[in-house]
C-alpha cells in the first residue's frame, strides 16, 4: 500500500515544481506525463493542488483514467481541501524554507491584498518561477484560505477582496455578492455534497446508455451538410454567386458542430478516429485548426468565465464581459497582458452596438489563430497527438488551394465578385459565433475561490437555449451548453435526453438551471454587454474628471505661486 502524504508534503512537492494533482484518494505526480497530454499543459496546471476527480472523470474515458494511476506517488486518507494552483496565484514554500515544523496550512500563506496591490504586477525571475506559474505574479480575486460568504463588509473593510471605492471594482463585488446570495454556500462540506450528487447523476446518465452514439443521426447531419455544399457548388456553376456563398457559409456553420463533437471524442469515443474526423472536417473543408480549438477549449471548460484564465471571454479590445478586464489583466492562457488601451476605451463603451457587426468577421480571426497554432507548434509535440500538427498543416494548405484558388480566383470573373463571395460566405457563418458566445457572455464571471465544486461552477457560468427538437440541428448541440459542460463527452444527440435528469439534479442541490429562448437569450447577452459598457463609460468619465480637476488644481497653484513671486519682486524693487 502506498504511503500517506500529508498536506505539508504535497505543498512541499508543488513548491519544488512538481505537477501534483489529487484523483479520488490518490496523489498523482504528472511531471513525466504532462508533455504528452493531448489537451496541453495549461489545463493540467489549473488542477495542481486540487481534487480533480470530477474534471478527470468528465473529460476522459475509463481506459485513459486507468493510465493516470501509474503516476501515483502516494495517497490521502483525510478530506482534501483544494489549494490555489500556482498558475492562479497560489504561493508555496518548501519544508526547509519554513520556520515552523508543525502542521502547515498552505492555504493561509497569502496576505490580504488591496486592488492597488493587485495592479502592481511583478515579473517573476525565470529561475524562481515554477513551470506552471505565469511570468508575472497573479493576485487572485479570492486570496488563498478565504472561503467567500455573504458577510463581505468586513472583507471590504480589510481589503481582503478589493477596495470598494473604485467604481468598476465595486460593480464586480456586487456581482460576487449576488452569486453568493443566489447559489449554495461555498462551505467545503456543502460543496462536497453537491459533487457527490453530481457523481450519482453521472452514474444515472451512464446507466441510461446516453454515452452510446446514435450514428443514424450523424448520417443525417452529413447528408444535410453535403446537400448544402452540393447546392452551393451547383449555384456557383450557374454564376449565382451570392446564394452560392450563403449556402457555403451555412454548410461551414453546420460543419463546426461535427468538429466540436469529434474534438470532445463524443462520436466514436476513439481518440484517434474522432480526431481524424474532426481535423478533416475542420481543416480540409473549413480551414480551421481543431488542435488550436482543443487547446483553447480544454482550458475554457476548466476555468469557465474567469476573466484572468478563460480565453473564451478574453476578447479585448473589442469586448469586455467583466469589469475586471478594465484593469489590464494578465492572461495566463495567452501569457500576456490584455491591455485596456485607448482603442478598447473607445470600443467597449459601445460594445452592445458593435456585438453583431464584429461577430460577422469572427471567422477571419479563427484563420489567424489556426495558422499561428500550426506554424508555431503550440499543440502537442510528443505522444499520440504529435502528428496532428503536420496533418493539419497539409489540411489548411489544401483548404487555401480549393477555396481561395479554385473557387475565388478561378471561378470569380472580377475582384469585386471575389470580394463579395468571400465576405458573404464568411458573414453567413456569423450565427455560429452568436451561438458560441450566447452560452457564456451573460453568465457569471465571479471568482468564488477553490472550494467551489466542478458542477456548481459549470451551472453558474453556462446557459442553455430552449428550442423544439426538430430545430436542434440548427444549434448543433450548443443549445445544451449547461449539460455539455457537465458531461463533455456525451454525444450531442443525447443531450436533450439528459436534460430532465440535470434539471432534477439542480432542484435537489438548489442550483439554478439557466435556460432562455434564442431571442430572449440574445436580449440577456446584449443587456449584459450594455451594463459593462456603462461601467466602462462611467469609469472613463471619472478618470477624465479627476484628470481635469488635477490639471485645474495645478494651474491655480502655479498661478498663485507666480503671483506671489511677482509681488515679492515688486516689494524688493
UniProtKB/Swiss-Prot annotation:
It is a multi-pass membrane protein. Residues 2-77 form the Cytochrome b5 heme-binding domain. Heme binds at residues 37, 60. A motif (Histidine box-2) lies at residues 297-301. GO terms for biological process: sphingolipid metabolic process. InterPro entries: Cyt_B5-like_heme/steroid-bd, Cyt_B5-like_heme/steroid_sf, FA_desaturase_dom, Fatty_acid_desaturase. The chain crosses the membrane at residues 228-248, 273-293, 353-372, 393-413, 422-442. It comes from the Eukaryota. A motif (Histidine box-1) lies at residues 260-264. Pathway: Lipid metabolism; sphingolipid metabolism. It is found in: Membrane. It catalyses: an N-acylsphing-4-enine + 2 Fe(II)-[cytochrome b5] + O2 + 2 H(+) = a (4E,8E)-4-sphinga-4,8-dienine ceramide + 2 Fe(III)-[cytochrome b5] + 2 H2O. Its EC number is 1.14.19.18. GO terms for molecular function: metal ion binding; oxidoreductase activity, acting on paired donors, with oxidation of a pair of donors resulting in the reduction of molecular oxygen to two molecules of water. A motif (Histidine box-3) lies at residues 481-485. One of its GO terms (cellular component) is membrane. SUPFAM superfamilies: Cytochrome b5-like heme/steroid binding domain. Pfam families: Cyt-b5, FA_desaturase. Keywords: Electron transport, Heme, Iron, Lipid metabolism, Membrane, Metal-binding, Oxidoreductase, Sphingolipid metabolism, Transmembrane, Transmembrane helix, Transport. The histidine box domains may contain the active site and/or be involved in metal ion binding. Belongs to the fatty acid desaturase type 1 family. PANTHER family: DELTA 8-(E)-SPHINGOLIPID DESATURASE, FATTY ACID DESATURASE 2. Delta(8)-fatty-acid desaturase which introduces a double bond at the 8-position in the long-chain base (LCB) of ceramides. Required for the formation of the di-unsaturated sphingoid base (E,E)-sphinga-4,8-dienine during glucosylceramide (GluCer) biosynthesis. This is Delta 8-(E)-sphingolipid desaturase. It comes from Kluyveromyces lactis.
